[in-house]
Amino acid sequence: MFDSFLHKNMRVPYRLHAKKMRSSENPKAVVVFIHGIASNAAMWKKAESEIEGEFDIYAVDLIGHGKSPKPKWLGAQSLAVQARAVRRMVFTMKKYKKPLFLVGHSMGSLVAAEFSKMYPNLVDKIFLLSPPIYSPEEARESVQEFILKKSYQKIVSDPKESIKFVNTAIGMGVADVEKFDSQEQFRPVRRSLKEAIIQQDTFAVLSKTETPTKIIYGAFDPVVIGRNIRKLGRINDKIKVSRVLSAHDPTKSMISQVSKDINKALKEQK
């Protein structure tokens, strides 16, 4: 009850577990990696080595994941609550006056977009890798999007059957994450799916964003709706879109674009 009062009613941000992946003597910027659903900070180990430049690089465990808190109150894993926790992490680094770049994958990209809406003066650019951005309710959905949303609702409402389905999908290589051994382990993932992905308003957020944004997605990604992303690129000139030959997980070509764009942005700031 106290946890709910403190973090829900008083809106005190949660303290996320964060891993410092690189420390530079004279960092030109701070880069924060934000993982996707059912993952954790460790997923960025290879990506960190592919970022070129003198940066301090961090990776966080989002609420409900890894070593971060796993609260049970409704809404604890919403995008706004996650973004507040990322802001706390940025402040505690004591280097938030440096240029800040957020790199999010999948659900983490939705958190990065929410952060840019809530704290536009804190972030210089966001990179959204494989973002599952879905249409507003009043918009006309594609068949793929309709099926995805129905599948997500099924996972949330029927945990017994859905854990089998998800583990089968993981076994087929749809996502590079560990299989779930129990409902206790699976519960935070279902909460994230409901509160962050199903209940998102990221399309509306990005359609109005003033934060420089780069979206990179795979041509063969089964959970990303390419036409939604391309539409955002058309209606907002702050958003640049790139499609690569990949599925859902981050690839070397994605991280290479991130690295080049960060260094380009820093040169343009001089």
Q: Where do the model's predicted regions map?
A:
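Flexible "cap/lid" loop of the alpha/beta hydrolase fold
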Residues: 113, 117, 126-155
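Conserved HGGG/HGGXW glycine-rich cap/lid loop of the alpha/beta-hydrolase fold
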Residues: 19-69
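Acidic catalytic loop of the alpha/beta-hydrolase fold
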Residues: 219-224, 248-249
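Alpha/beta-hydrolase fold catalytic core
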Residues: 1-32, 52-56, 89-97, 133, ...
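Active-site loop/oxyanion-hole signature of alpha/beta-hydrolase fold enzymes
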Residues: 62-103
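Short beta-strand/loop motif that positions the catalytic acidic residue
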Residues: 209, 215-217
